[in-house]
């Protein structure tokens, strides 16, 4: 088994990268992919860059070059579910774009033309993540993660997203693009992110302060998931 792991930023991949054994690096088109073994599992760790285009391009390179059996998207997110605090975990049941709008042609908010309204995470991977959450005794929410090319900071964009997607649990900038590419490649995926900020008018200050906390929490989750997969054989 080979597991693809995707993080957007250096802070989101550095702890995992440093623990990869027999590490090799592929750099292409602004992306870096690190291959080797982590916790007994063959891994391909992608640092994609920030935003939907970078995430889609990087995920495509990862799937084409490394052919992982599954993909886990890690990193940070802004929490919208009322129970989420900094350091808590959000697990995707599905991902959607919050900045796509072709509703004039009968599509749902966030639905890209010719695509499903949502890209649905793999149930077995969701169960794996939630099992690890219980083992680690972390606070977590399973729910909708919405992505767009904007850092959500302030009342107006927050209200717009909540109005269009009432069940949204978290927002960030890559997950829907990753889910979209995995859907096209028929590759199972799940998004497991730690909360770096609670989306409000001071989100940017919280993000800068707590990104390292979120990175440590999401790394803890990835390592637990890999260990469980290795134990299952």
Swiss-Prot record:
InterPro entries: MTA_SAH_Nsdase (IPR010049), Nucleoside_phosphorylase_d (IPR000845), Nucleoside_phosphorylase_sf (IPR035994). It is an enzyme of class 3 (hydrolase). GO terms for molecular function: adenosylhomocysteine nucleosidase activity; methylthioadenosine nucleosidase activity. It catalyses: S-adenosyl-L-homocysteine + H2O = S-(5-deoxy-D-ribos-5-yl)-L-homocysteine + adenine; S-methyl-5'-thioadenosine + H2O = 5-(methylsulfanyl)-D-ribose + adenine; 5'-deoxyadenosine + H2O = 5-deoxy-D-ribose + adenine. The keyword Amino-acid biosynthesis applies. GO terms for biological process: L-methionine salvage from methylthioadenosine; L-methionine salvage from S-adenosylmethionine; purine deoxyribonucleoside catabolic process. The keyword Hydrolase applies. Its EC number is 3.2.2.9. Keywords: Amino-acid biosynthesis, Hydrolase, Methionine biosynthesis. Pathway: Amino-acid biosynthesis; L-methionine biosynthesis via salvage pathway; S-methyl-5-thio-alpha-D-ribose 1-phosphate from S-methyl-5'-thioadenosine (hydrolase route): step 1/2. GO terms for cellular component: cytosol. Pfam families: PNP_UDP_1. The active site is at residues 12, 197. Gene3D superfamilies: Nucleoside phosphorylase domain. PANTHER family: 5'-METHYLTHIOADENOSINE/S-ADENOSYLHOMOCYSTEINE NUCLEOSIDASE, 5'-METHYLTHIOADENOSINE_S-ADENOSYLHOMOCYSTEINE NUCLEOSIDASE. Belongs to the PNP/UDP phosphorylase family. MtnN subfamily. Catalyzes the irreversible cleavage of the glycosidic bond in both 5'-methylthioadenosine (MTA) and S-adenosylhomocysteine (SAH/AdoHcy) to adenine and the corresponding thioribose, 5'-methylthioribose and S-ribosylhomocysteine, respectively. Also cleaves 5'-deoxyadenosine, a toxic by-product of radical S-adenosylmethionine (SAM) enzymes, into 5-deoxyribose and adenine. Thus, is required for in vivo function of the radical SAM enzymes biotin synthase and lipoic acid synthase, that are inhibited by 5'-deoxyadenosine accumulation. This is 5'-methylthioadenosine/S-adenosylhomocysteine nucleosidase. It comes from Yersinia pseudotuberculosis serotype O:1b (strain IP 31758). The lineage of its organism: Bacteria, Pseudomonadati, Pseudomonadota, Gammaproteobacteria, Enterobacterales.
């Amino acid at each position: 088994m080979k597991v693809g792991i995707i993080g957007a930023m250096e802070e989101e991949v550095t702890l995992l990268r440093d623990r990869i054994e027999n590490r090799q690096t592929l750099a292409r088109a602004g992306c870096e992919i690190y291959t080797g073994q982590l916790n007994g599992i063959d891994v391909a760790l992608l640092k994609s860059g920030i935003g939907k285009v970078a995430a889609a391009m990087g995920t495509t390179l990862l799937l084409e070059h490394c052919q992982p059996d599954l993909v886990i998207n890690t990193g940070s997110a802004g929490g919208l579910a009322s129970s989420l605090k900094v350091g808590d975990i959000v697990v995707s049941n599905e991902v959607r774009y919050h900045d796509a709008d072709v509703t004039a042609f009968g599509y749902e908010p966030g639905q890209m033309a010719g695509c499903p309204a949502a890209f649905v995470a793999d149930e077995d991977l969701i169960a794996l993540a939630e099992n690890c959450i219980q083992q680690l005794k972390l606070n977590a929410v399973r729910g909708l993660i919405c992505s767009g090319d904007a850092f959500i900071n302030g009342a107006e964009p927050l209200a717009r997203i909540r109005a269009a997607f009432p069940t949204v649990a978290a927002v960030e900038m890559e997950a829907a693009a990753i889910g979209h590419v995995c859907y096209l490649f028929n590759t199972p995926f799940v998004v497991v992110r730690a909360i770096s900020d609670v989306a409000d008018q001071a989100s940017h200050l919280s993000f800068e302060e707590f990104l390292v906390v979120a990175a440590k929490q999401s790394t803890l989750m990835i390592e637990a998931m890999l260990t469980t997969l290795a134990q299952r054989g």
